[in-house]
Regions:
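Terminal helix/beta-alpha structural elements that buttress the NAD(P)+-binding lobe
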Residues: 1-206
Length: 206
């Protein structure tokens, strides 16, 4: 069951942090959307690289995000992480609910903001819009020393092996919110659409 919850979300987190974000030990990393399917993997993967991790989530998920390794947790219902004096080397943004300038404000001068398939303030549906967002992020980043990168993860066997090693070593554990039967798939989708899933939602095919 845990293995079934890994591939897409964990690869998205791994490639975003390692390949796009160039994560290094000792860096200060912020994960916006830390309690979701990708975010729970991102927190653990960032910790495996030796980063100091801050997770952003709602009140009900604070303990969860702390339990998977976050050094600091920001409750977005009580505090806006873009309105503090804290600066980060890497922002892994899975929500996109802040403007370009707000994200610039909390990045170090040579910091990187990685957006998983988003290019502005808010999620966008459709491949064309996502690619437009990627181009927009690239053009903007040419005018500042900070980098803003939007991407879509690519599945490959090599990264699956990396993730397998993290699972076996105990450095990464899938967080499963709910499990549905195949004939309950519609219910699972409705739950996901609410945007409040903690970790992954799994459909059991047996």
């Amino acid at each position: 069951m845990q293995a079934a919850s890994v591939p897409v979300a964990a690869i998205t987190a791994l490639q975003g942090l390692r390949d796009k974000g160039k994560i290094q030990a000792g860096q200060k990393v912020l994960v916006n959307g830390a309690s979701g399917g990708v975010g729970t993997f991102a927190v653990q993967i960032a910790k495996s690289f030796g980063a100091e991790v801050t997770g952003v989530c709602s009140t009900r998920n604070v303990d969860l995000v702390r339990s998977i390794g976050a050094d600091h947790v920001v409750d977005y219902t009580k505090e806006d992480f873009t309105k503090t004096d804290q600066r980060y080397d890497l922002i892994f943004d899975l929500v996109g609910n802040h403007s370009f300038s707000e994200r610039r404000h909390i990045l170090n001068p040579n910091g990187i903001c990685v957006m998983a398939g988003i290019g502005g303030a808010g999620w966008h549906d459709g491949m064309g819009i996502r690619l437009a967002g990627e181009l927009d992020a690239y053009v903007r980043s040419r005018f500042v020393s900070q980098k803003f990168i939007s991407y879509i993860a690519q599945f490959n066997k090599r990264d699956m092996m990396v993730l397998g090693d993290l699972l076996q070593s105990g450095k990464m554990t899938p967080v499963i919110d709910r499990t549905y039967k195949l004939n309950e798939a519609a219910d699972a989708l409705r739950y996901l659409e609410q945007g409040h899933a903690r970790g992954k939602v799994v459909i059991n095919l047996e």
